[in-house]
Amino acid sequence: MNIFRLTGDLSHLAAIIILLLKIWKSRSCAGISGKSQILFALVFTTRYLDLLTSFISLYNTCMKVIYIGCAYATVYLIYAKFRATYDGNHDTFRAEFLVVPVGGLAFLVNHDFSPLEILWTFSIYLESVAILPQLFMISKTGEAETITTHYLFCLGVYRALYLFNWIWRFYFEGFFDMIAIVAGVVQTILYCDFFYLYVTKVLKGKKLSLPA
């Protein structure tokens, strides 16, 4: 494992912990897109089905279990425990417009036409756009809480670091996965505007708000 993957995993884990703590400590899921969290739960479920068929390492297994468990815990907090605070009026992105095309693409473009491989490919494609409902929600409300922006920043850093991980693996291991790289580039591009606002506003102590 190289440093880019390790720090990417830690950044991803930090994002998940930040989100869970934000919801639990504030007893509110205001400003959080439940639809994005459902999509992430679907991403981890379809990607890590290999937990049932193979063992790579203790680290790998633990991280997969943590991701799946935290994803469903987040969905539970939003749609059950703190449902009264969920802002469904602004969380209106049509998630099916992401899931259906991504599902079709996974069938057409994959490494191997087998159930597990198609589901893994589906998860890679879906993860690249799963944050769109959250970004759409922020665009509708015009602002985001600081802790929510920290969560999004850590997610963006995780994906950017994974791009460097693929570059490292190509040069030092001769490993190249076009599907993962293209999806990672798409996901990183989606965060670009947010990164700019994060650096110019949030890091300077200002609240992230979008122009009217």
Curated annotation (Swiss-Prot):
Example of a GO cellular component annotation carried by this entry: COPI-coated vesicle membrane
Region (Interaction with the K-D-E-L motif on target proteins) location: 47-48, 159-169
Site annotation Important for recycling of cargo proteins with the sequence motif K-D-E-L from the Golgi to the endoplasmic reticulum: residues: D193
Domain of life, per lineage: Eukaryota
Membrane topology: Multi-pass membrane protein
Cytoplasmic topological intervals: 25-32, 80-92, 136-149, 200-212
Residue numbers spanned by region Important for recycling of cargo proteins with the sequence motif K-D-E-L from the Golgi to the endoplasmic reticulum: 204-207
Annotated site residues (Interaction with the K-D-E-L motif on target proteins) in this chain: R5, S54, E117
Keywords of this entry: Cytoplasmic vesicle, Endoplasmic reticulum, ER-Golgi transport, Golgi apparatus, Membrane, Protein transport, Receptor, Transmembrane, Transmembrane helix, Transport
Transmembrane feature ranges: 5-24, 33-52, 59-79, 93-110, 117-135, 150-168, 179-199
Keyword Coiled coil applies: no
PROSITE patterns: ER_LUMEN_RECEPTOR_1 (PS00951), ER_LUMEN_RECEPTOR_2 (PS00952)
InterPro entries, per the entry: ER_ret_rcpt (IPR000133)
Family: Belongs to the ERD2 family.
Domain writeup: Binds the C-terminal sequence motif K-D-E-L in a hydrophilic cavity between the transmembrane domains. This triggers a conformation change that exposes a Lys-rich patch on the cytosolic surface of the protein. This patch mediates recycling from the Golgi to the endoplasmic reticulum, probably via COPI vesicles.
Protein name in UniProt: ER lumen protein-retaining receptor 2
The organism's taxonomic lineage, starting at the top: Eukaryota, Metazoa, Chordata, Craniata, Vertebrata
Encoding gene per record: kdelr2
